[in-house]
Design a protein with these regions (language model features):
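Noncatalytic regulatory segments and standalone regulatory/sensor domains
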Residues: 112-275
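A sequence-level detector of short, solvent-exposed, charge-rich linear segments
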Residues: 34-38, 79, 83, 270, ...
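Cysteine-nucleophile protease catalytic domains, especially the papain-like/related folds used
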Residues: 1-73, 247-248
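Low-complexity, compositionally biased segments
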Residues: 20-23, 39, 106, 122, ...
């Protein structure tokens, strides 16, 4: 079994467990570093994403295509999932654990009327390594629509890493602009709560995780300082102008440093033609 080795990496550990089924021995952090995950930022609608939140075929194939695999996604209605899984082990899907979060698990087959899953977890966690769920229990943890991911073998092909990297600096600058606009205007508690996930998470949670993965301590420490200032304000649940209480200049300096690192990686890949 492959374990989670960095924060929120259950889908990347799940990908490692899918590959393990096919005889490919790799860890989630190796996948992340190979595809330059710490330097990738993206936007989906109003939400910005980075690090372990970049998941699914678009991102997993950056690693998979060069080694001869493709990530297939099937979008199913909740009622279709159980019958589909029976014929398609191994397969990865997300179980709803709270109204705000899901946890990626890997279906490995059925036993005694139960559905068995690898529970992608940290090695030192006391959680079970295998989840066994009845059909009723499984359905209770599924969204109305479920994406099930599987691997198929293909001929090795180049990845789209260059394009994904090239777009990241612009996305990060757009995120910086939105954060500054948001922080310098009075915001309601509801707006602050939404921004915590849509605007701040890519830097102050997943961004810190990615910098720690790189052992890049200085910008990570600065971002942790800003996070420590921000979270009590949002938890207080009061209308506020965030820039009056957080060090926006420190945050902007950290973003600029992060942006410079991404540009350096983009230049390296352009000059060397490096690709996974």
């Amino acid at each position: 079994m492959k374990y989670m080795t960095f924060n929120a990496s259950c889908s990347y550990a799940g990908l490692a467990n899918l590959l393990d089924w096919y005889g490919v021995d790799v860890e989630d952090r190796v996948i992340a570093l190979k595809i330059e995950l710490p330097y990738l930022f993206a936007r989906e609608g109003r939400r910005y994403l980075s690090g372990p939140m970049l998941q699914g075929a678009e991102w997993f194939d950056l690693y998979l295509h060069p080694i001869g695999f493709n990530f297939i996604e099937r979008r199913l209605e909740r009622a279709e999932v159980c019958s589909f899984l029976k014929d398609h082990p191994p397969a990865m899907l997300g179980l709803r654990v709270t109204p705000e979060s899901k946890h990626a698990v890997v279906y490995t087959g059925g036993r005694g009327g139960e559905y068995c899953f690898i529970n992608n977890k940290r090695q030192d966690s006391t959680e079970p390594e295998t989840l066994r769920l009845t059909e009723t229990a499984l359905l209770s943890h599924l969204d109305k629509t479920v994406v099930v991911g599987m691997l198929e073998k293909i001929g090795p092909r180049p990845s789209a890493l260059h394009d994904r990297l090239a777009g990241s600096p612009g996305v990060l600058l757009a995120l910086q602009s939105e954060i500054n606009d948001f922080c310098t205007q009075q915001q309601t508690p509801a707006a602050q709560a939404a921004a915590l996930n849509d605007l701040f998470r890519p830097l102050l949670l997943d961004g810190i995780t990615m910098l720690e993965l790189l052992e890049d301590t200085e910008p990570a420490a600065s971002l942790r300082t800003v996070r420590a200032q921000l979270l009590p304000l949002i938890r207080a649940g009061r209308p506020t102008v965030l820039s009056e209480s957080i060090d926006l200049s420190l945050l902007n300096a950290s973003i600029r440093a992060y942006h410079d690192r991404i540009k350096q990686i983009c230049l390296y890949h352009t000059q060397t033609g490096a690709n996974p």
